[in-house]
Curated annotation (Swiss-Prot):
Catalytically driven reaction(s): AMP + ATP = 2 ADP
Source species: Paracidovorax citrulli (strain AAC00-1) (Acidovorax citrulli)
Free-text note on domains in this protein's UniProt record: Consists of three domains, a large central CORE domain and two small peripheral domains, NMPbind and LID, which undergo movements during catalysis. The LID domain closes over the site of phosphoryl transfer upon ATP binding. Assembling and dissambling the active center during each catalytic cycle provides an effective means to prevent ATP hydrolysis.
Protein's name according to its UniProt entry: Adenylate kinase
Gene Ontology MF terms in the entry: adenylate kinase activity; ATP binding
Length: 218
Protein backbone atom coordinates (compact mmCIF):
# COMPACT_ATOMS: atom_id res chain seq x y z
CA UNK A 1 0.00 0.00 0.00
CA UNK A 2 1.70 3.15 -1.26
CA UNK A 3 -0.31 6.26 -0.64
CA UNK A 4 -0.40 10.00 -0.18
CA UNK A 5 -2.64 11.48 2.50
CA UNK A 6 -3.98 14.93 1.63
CA UNK A 7 -5.95 17.34 3.79
CA UNK A 8 -5.81 20.79 5.31
CA UNK A 9 -3.98 21.49 8.58
CA UNK A 10 -6.35 20.40 11.35
CA UNK A 11 -8.19 17.87 9.15
CA UNK A 12 -7.00 14.99 11.36
CA UNK A 13 -4.42 13.49 8.97
CA UNK A 14 -1.99 12.53 11.74
CA UNK A 15 -4.58 10.51 13.64
CA UNK A 16 -5.77 8.65 10.53
CA UNK A 17 -2.22 8.10 9.26
CA UNK A 18 -1.43 6.19 12.47
CA UNK A 19 -4.42 3.85 11.98
CA UNK A 20 -3.70 3.28 8.28
CA UNK A 21 0.00 2.57 8.91
CA UNK A 22 -0.86 0.09 11.66
CA UNK A 23 -3.43 -1.69 9.47
CA UNK A 24 -1.06 -2.09 6.49
CA UNK A 25 2.23 -2.41 8.39
CA UNK A 26 3.80 0.56 6.59
CA UNK A 27 5.81 3.57 7.81
CA UNK A 28 4.46 7.12 7.87
CA UNK A 29 6.89 9.40 6.04
CA UNK A 30 6.92 13.16 6.46
CA UNK A 31 9.50 15.37 4.79
CA UNK A 32 10.45 16.89 8.16
CA UNK A 33 11.22 13.49 9.71
CA UNK A 34 13.00 12.38 6.56
CA UNK A 35 15.21 15.47 6.47
CA UNK A 36 16.07 15.18 10.16
CA UNK A 37 16.94 11.47 9.79
CA UNK A 38 19.15 12.08 6.73
CA UNK A 39 20.98 14.96 8.44
CA UNK A 40 21.47 12.88 11.59
CA UNK A 41 22.74 9.88 9.61
CA UNK A 42 25.17 12.16 7.76
CA UNK A 43 24.34 10.67 4.34
CA UNK A 44 25.61 12.61 1.30
CA UNK A 45 22.06 13.90 0.69
CA UNK A 46 21.70 14.68 4.40
CA UNK A 47 24.91 16.73 4.31
CA UNK A 48 23.62 18.66 1.29
CA UNK A 49 20.30 19.31 3.03
CA UNK A 50 22.06 20.42 6.22
CA UNK A 51 24.19 22.95 4.31
CA UNK A 52 21.06 24.43 2.71
CA UNK A 53 19.11 24.58 5.99
CA UNK A 54 22.09 26.01 7.92
CA UNK A 55 22.15 28.82 5.37
CA UNK A 56 18.49 29.49 6.20
CA UNK A 57 17.30 28.46 2.73
CA UNK A 58 14.54 26.09 1.63
CA UNK A 59 15.56 22.61 0.52
CA UNK A 60 15.00 22.28 -3.25
CA UNK A 61 12.41 19.92 -4.72
CA UNK A 62 15.19 17.96 -6.49
CA UNK A 63 16.92 17.27 -3.20
CA UNK A 64 13.63 16.33 -1.51
CA UNK A 65 12.78 13.89 -4.34
CA UNK A 66 16.21 12.25 -4.05
CA UNK A 67 15.68 11.91 -0.30
CA UNK A 68 12.25 10.38 -0.96
CA UNK A 69 13.70 7.83 -3.41
CA UNK A 70 16.37 6.94 -0.84
CA UNK A 71 13.80 6.63 1.93
CA UNK A 72 11.33 4.40 0.08
CA UNK A 73 14.17 2.04 -0.89
CA UNK A 74 14.66 1.21 2.83
CA UNK A 75 13.60 -2.28 4.03
CA UNK A 76 10.71 -0.95 6.16
CA UNK A 77 9.02 0.30 2.96
CA UNK A 78 8.84 -3.21 1.45
CA UNK A 79 5.04 -3.33 1.98
CA UNK A 80 4.58 0.32 1.06
CA UNK A 81 4.51 3.71 2.75
CA UNK A 82 2.29 6.65 3.61
CA UNK A 83 3.34 10.18 2.67
CA UNK A 84 2.00 12.80 5.06
CA UNK A 85 2.48 16.42 3.98
CA UNK A 86 4.27 15.45 0.78
CA UNK A 87 4.04 16.39 -2.03
CA UNK A 88 3.11 19.88 -0.90
CA UNK A 89 3.11 21.59 -4.31
CA UNK A 90 2.41 20.77 -7.97
CA UNK A 91 6.15 20.96 -8.91
CA UNK A 92 6.88 18.34 -6.20
CA UNK A 93 4.08 16.12 -7.55
CA UNK A 94 5.45 16.52 -11.11
CA UNK A 95 8.98 15.71 -9.91
CA UNK A 96 7.72 12.59 -8.13
CA UNK A 97 5.91 11.48 -11.29
CA UNK A 98 9.02 12.12 -13.42
CA UNK A 99 11.13 10.13 -10.94
CA UNK A 100 8.80 7.16 -11.45
CA UNK A 101 7.67 6.92 -7.81
CA UNK A 102 4.72 4.50 -7.98
CA UNK A 103 1.63 5.14 -5.87
CA UNK A 104 -1.54 3.10 -5.30
CA UNK A 105 -3.82 5.71 -3.74
CA UNK A 106 -4.21 9.39 -3.01
CA UNK A 107 -6.63 9.81 -0.11
CA UNK A 108 -8.04 13.22 0.72
CA UNK A 109 -9.57 13.91 4.14
CA UNK A 110 -12.01 16.71 3.43
CA UNK A 111 -13.14 19.00 6.26
CA UNK A 112 -14.83 22.38 5.64
CA UNK A 113 -12.56 25.27 6.62
CA UNK A 114 -15.08 26.74 9.08
CA UNK A 115 -15.15 23.40 10.93
CA UNK A 116 -11.32 23.37 11.06
CA UNK A 117 -11.25 26.93 12.43
CA UNK A 118 -13.79 25.98 15.11
CA UNK A 119 -11.89 22.75 15.90
CA UNK A 120 -8.48 24.40 16.24
CA UNK A 121 -9.27 27.84 17.65
CA UNK A 122 -11.32 26.26 20.46
CA UNK A 123 -8.40 24.23 21.82
CA UNK A 124 -7.07 25.14 25.26
CA UNK A 125 -4.30 23.49 27.27
CA UNK A 126 -2.78 23.34 30.74
CA UNK A 127 0.96 23.58 30.01
CA UNK A 128 2.23 21.99 33.24
CA UNK A 129 0.24 18.75 32.90
CA UNK A 130 -0.39 18.60 29.15
CA UNK A 131 -4.16 18.31 29.76
CA UNK A 132 -6.18 19.59 26.81
CA UNK A 133 -9.69 20.98 26.51
CA UNK A 134 -11.97 22.44 23.88
CA UNK A 135 -14.28 25.36 24.61
CA UNK A 136 -17.15 23.65 22.76
CA UNK A 137 -16.44 19.90 22.52
CA UNK A 138 -14.65 19.26 25.83
CA UNK A 139 -14.95 22.36 28.04
CA UNK A 140 -13.33 22.66 31.48
CA UNK A 141 -15.68 22.74 34.49
CA UNK A 142 -14.78 26.41 35.07
CA UNK A 143 -14.23 28.51 31.96
CA UNK A 144 -10.52 29.11 31.29
CA UNK A 145 -9.35 27.02 34.28
CA UNK A 146 -7.77 23.56 34.56
CA UNK A 147 -10.13 21.01 36.17
CA UNK A 148 -7.48 19.58 38.52
CA UNK A 149 -5.37 22.56 39.60
CA UNK A 150 -7.67 25.50 38.85
CA UNK A 151 -4.74 27.16 37.03
CA UNK A 152 -5.22 29.25 33.89
CA UNK A 153 -5.52 27.48 30.54
CA UNK A 154 -3.69 28.85 27.51
CA UNK A 155 -4.35 28.96 23.80
CA UNK A 156 -1.26 28.02 21.77
CA UNK A 157 -0.13 30.51 19.10
CA UNK A 158 -0.71 27.81 16.45
CA UNK A 159 -4.36 27.51 17.51
CA UNK A 160 -5.22 31.23 17.40
CA UNK A 161 -7.87 31.96 14.79
CA UNK A 162 -5.68 34.33 12.74
CA UNK A 163 -2.85 31.77 12.64
CA UNK A 164 -5.23 28.97 11.62
CA UNK A 165 -6.70 31.16 8.85
CA UNK A 166 -3.22 32.00 7.54
CA UNK A 167 -2.24 28.31 7.45
CA UNK A 168 -5.44 27.51 5.57
CA UNK A 169 -4.70 30.28 3.05
CA UNK A 170 -1.24 28.80 2.39
CA UNK A 171 -2.82 25.34 2.03
CA UNK A 172 -5.43 26.71 -0.43
CA UNK A 173 -2.76 28.35 -2.57
CA UNK A 174 -0.09 25.64 -2.53
CA UNK A 175 -1.48 22.23 -1.62
CA UNK A 176 -5.20 22.28 -2.40
CA UNK A 177 -4.42 22.30 -6.18
CA UNK A 178 -3.00 18.76 -5.71
CA UNK A 179 -6.57 17.51 -5.20
CA UNK A 180 -7.39 18.64 -8.74
CA UNK A 181 -4.02 17.35 -10.02
CA UNK A 182 -4.48 13.79 -8.76
CA UNK A 183 -8.22 13.52 -9.42
CA UNK A 184 -7.70 14.69 -13.04
CA UNK A 185 -4.76 12.32 -13.55
CA UNK A 186 -6.84 9.39 -12.21
CA UNK A 187 -9.67 10.29 -14.60
CA UNK A 188 -7.46 10.75 -17.68
CA UNK A 189 -4.91 7.97 -17.19
CA UNK A 190 -6.36 5.32 -14.84
CA UNK A 191 -3.81 2.69 -15.89
CA UNK A 192 -0.85 4.70 -14.55
CA UNK A 193 -2.33 7.11 -12.03
CA UNK A 194 -2.92 6.32 -8.37
CA UNK A 195 -6.59 5.86 -7.46
CA UNK A 196 -7.98 9.09 -6.05
CA UNK A 197 -10.40 8.87 -3.11
CA UNK A 198 -11.93 11.63 -0.97
CA UNK A 199 -13.66 11.04 2.36
CA UNK A 200 -15.39 13.35 4.82
CA UNK A 201 -13.23 14.15 7.84
CA UNK A 202 -16.13 15.17 10.06
CA UNK A 203 -17.55 12.82 12.70
CA UNK A 204 -15.89 10.63 15.32
CA UNK A 205 -12.34 9.33 14.89
CA UNK A 206 -13.76 5.80 14.50
CA UNK A 207 -16.21 6.87 11.76
CA UNK A 208 -13.45 8.61 9.80
CA UNK A 209 -11.13 5.58 10.17
CA UNK A 210 -13.89 3.30 8.84
CA UNK A 211 -14.36 5.60 5.83
CA UNK A 212 -10.61 5.74 5.20
CA UNK A 213 -10.10 1.97 5.32
CA UNK A 214 -13.18 1.38 3.13
CA UNK A 215 -11.87 3.87 0.55
CA UNK A 216 -8.49 2.11 0.45
CA UNK A 217 -10.11 -1.31 0.02
CA UNK A 218 -12.02 -0.10 -3.03
Amino acid sequence: MRLILLGAPGAGKGTQAAFICQKYGIPQISTGDMLRAAVKAGTPLGQQAKAVMDAGKLVSDDLIINLVKDRIAQPDCAKGFLFDGFPRTIPQADAMKAAGVKLDYVLEIDVPFDAIIERMSGRRSHPASGRTYHVKFNPPKVEGKDDVTGEDLIQREDDKEDTVKKRLEVYSAQTRPLVEYYSTWAKNDPANAPKYRAISGTGTVEEITRRALAALAD
